[in-house]
A protein has these predicted regions:
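Amphipathic/hydrophobic helical signal segments and adjacent flexible N-terminal regions
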Residues: 1-98, 109-110, 214-222
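Central antiparallel beta-sheet cores of small beta-barrel/beta-sandwich binding domains
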Residues: 86-222
């Protein structure tokens, strides 16, 4: 997986919000735990082994450091990156679609005889990272993304563009690079178009062709 960019300042705002929440939680936890921790400290003063530990370093202070704001922030951000951003109400605010899943459908390319072929697109996504892996059973090849960017049009349409490199298992087949643009028709339907620098004898030029596809996400995609 690789990082992807977003054409609005939402990530910076998320960081600020999570950090403020972390400070608040840290203050509350320190306040709630201060009395029992002081009580425990008094109790263990008479225990020889624990007295030695207390001489080496203040164990209780170390425990309080563990629940400090930076540690809480790291935990919350990890949780947000993996799970929270996909929750319905949070995602409505973020406006970044959750594309995780297996998408299948048909694609058509200007390469060769403009034949239609089967396409499967596997998308893995967190709040920070994403990957697109497209496989084409009819042609025995696979494309993998290497960069991506979300952008929202002025009319509210959500799109994502990603660069890719295509590799084939056939020795005689060439490797080539290209770019995809996906448009979300609905939560479980996407339409895409692409272009690449693959040699295209049909056009009588050294390289370049384009295509389009329509994919639907499986029932267990999310």
């Amino acid at each position: 997986m690789h990082v992807y960019s977003i054409d609005k300042d939402i990530r910076r705002k998320v960081i600020v919000v999570i950090f403020c929440i972390s400070i608040f939680i840290s203050i509350i936890m320190r306040y709630l735990l201060s009395v029992p921790i002081e009580f425990i400290g008094e109790c263990i003063k008479n225990v020889e082994l624990l007295k030695i530990l207390l001489q080496i370093g203040n164990v209780l202070d170390i425990f309080l450091d563990i629940i400090s704001a930076p540690v809480i922030y790291a935990i919350l951000y990890w949780w947000f990156d993996k799970k929270l951003w996909k929750m319905e109400y949070i995602n409505k605010v973020l406006q970044i679609p959750d594309l995780n899943g297996e998408w299948t459908g048909k694609a058509k390319s200007s390469f060769g005889d403009n034949n239609e072929y089967t396409m499967k697109l596997t998308i893995k996504q967190t709040w920070r990272k994403i990957s697109f892996v497209a496989s084409f059973p009819d042609t025995n090849s696979k494309s993998e993304s290497n960069c991506a960017s979300f952008f929202i049009e002025t009319n509210g349409d959500k799109k994502i563009g990603f660069g890719f490199v295509n590799r084939s298992r056939e020795v005689s087949a060439q490797q080539y690079d290209g770019y995809n643009v996906l448009e979300l028709d609905s939560e479980n339907e996407i339409a895409g178009r692409y272009f690449n620098n693959r040699d295209n004898s049909a056009f009588g030029i050294d390289g370049g062709n384009k295509g389009q596809f329509k994919l639907t996400r499986g029932a267990n995609g999310t």
